Amino acid sequence: MAVVVTAWLAPGEMVSFLSSLGPHVDFVPNAGNAGDALINVGCMDALERAGVEFTYWSQSQVETAPLGGRTVVMAGGGGLVPPYDTTARFLSILKERAGRLVVLPQTVVGHEALLAGLGPSVTFFGRERPTLEHLAKSAVGGAQVLGADDMAFHADIGRLLGFRVSDHGASIERLRMWAEPRLLSVVAGDRLSAFRLDAERTSVHVPHLNRDLSSLAFCGMENPGRCRLTSAYFVRYLDCFRTIETNRLHVGIASARLGKRVLLHGNSFFKVGAVYEASLAGPDVDVTYVPAPER
């Protein structure tokens, strides 16, 4: 059965789509790092704009949550790629239990058998061309396939900049983060290097004063408040700099949305470059893409 990618939804169209799901959904967020927290916040903010109430089920709660026959919205992200397996495991659970399942914009590599098993009760969003091409070949079980921007573009950045961290259990250690970026911005000349140091790192030179902010800013996602707390640390840290150089996709997205000058490097596969082409390669933001070094 051939799959037709029927549309790419603009942000307003995504909100309208979410509104069509009804007055209430069950929301399953990403696990991961501060970039994933920003995706989760974008999902929640879009649901709020759509007038849809939601129950938040952290991934530790999913296996026992009463989701049978209900409408479930799964956060987007980059977890359906090697070497990660958590997103695939939860997608396998949710496709069997949910009455209707919406998977918000993802990057996908592999997982052909899982994709082939997605039936007509599933709507699956890709966030860039390679994923949509892969879904067109692999999601042959009747799922609806759509395209849309990464959900971090739906996060209310102004709300995060005004977030009261003291209302959400912020420790003294975490509050010290506000001193470090201001000091670092002086030492590093108002320029932040935020290259990743994990499995998706490349051979790009990493400066001595590098801060892998997606890991550094993380302080939990067990409930909506902790997601917003993590995201608030994340965007406030970035807001202390004028120029950000990174190969972390959501450092790049958040920095662009803050109006910063961004040098966005590729990661270890196509993800960053493909999302840049889909959503950041325009005149409205100051983002320059730098391909990853050849291996």
Predicted regions and their residues:
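Active-site anion-handling motifs in enzyme catalytic cores
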Residues: M1-R295
